[in-house]
A protein has these predicted regions:
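Basic, glycine/lysine-rich polyanion-binding surfaces/domains
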Residues: 1-169
Length: 169
């Protein structure tokens, strides 16, 4: 289903992350997604802000009767923190229980990592043209991870920037 709907190849090895827009019948962008392959049969889809319902509906409308597909909306269970910039790996590594080095965690991949004692799905992607990560954190751990990032980030000149700040770049 996703291979048919996405404008990029998502038949990739588990752990791979792809920017994967879905097109409408006129060739315009219907959905703007990031797709991470978790296993041979499972994917993790990330919609743009406030677009989950729209994107799930688009996917559901294209499931063929012969396709056995389940789509589960887990939006309310996670918060996303973007950590971008040349010091992002150094900062994140101080809190992670796994090696985040370039050779073991290259661009366009994802790992499930313990960060500040919390289970975090980390996507090694960036929307700002710099080294960066998206941290997908269960909501019950979000404040813990945010505070830990800021505690370590003081020495790296970490600053908060709202999601819309990306549009100014």
């Amino acid at each position: 289903l996703l291979q048919r709907l996405c404008a990029t190849d998502v038949a990739v090895p588990p752990g791979t992350v792809r920017y994967a827009p879905m097109l409408d019948r006129h060739g315009g962008i219907a959905c703007d997604l990031t797709v991470a392959r978790l296993s041979p049969t499972d994917y993790y889809l990330v919609s743009g802000t406030a677009m989950a319902t729209h994107d799930i509906d688009h996917i559901a409308r294209h499931i063929r009767p012969t396709e056995s597909v389940s789509v589960v909306d887990i939006t309310s269970g996670y918060g996303v923190l973007g950590l971008m910039g040349p010091q992002s790996r150094t900062l994140l590594q101080r809190l992670a229980e796994s090696d985040l080095g370039r050779d073991v965690f290259p661009f366009g991949t994802m790992q499930d990592v313990m960060i500040a004692g919390a289970p975090v799905r980390v996507l090694r992607i960036s929307l700002v043209g710099e080294l960066g990560y998206e941290l997908h954190v269960p909501t019950e751990y979000l404040l813990t991870v945010f505070d830990a990032l800021h505690d370590v980030g003081i020495e790296h000149d970490l600053m908060n920037a709202g999601y819309r700040a990306i549009d100014s770049l």
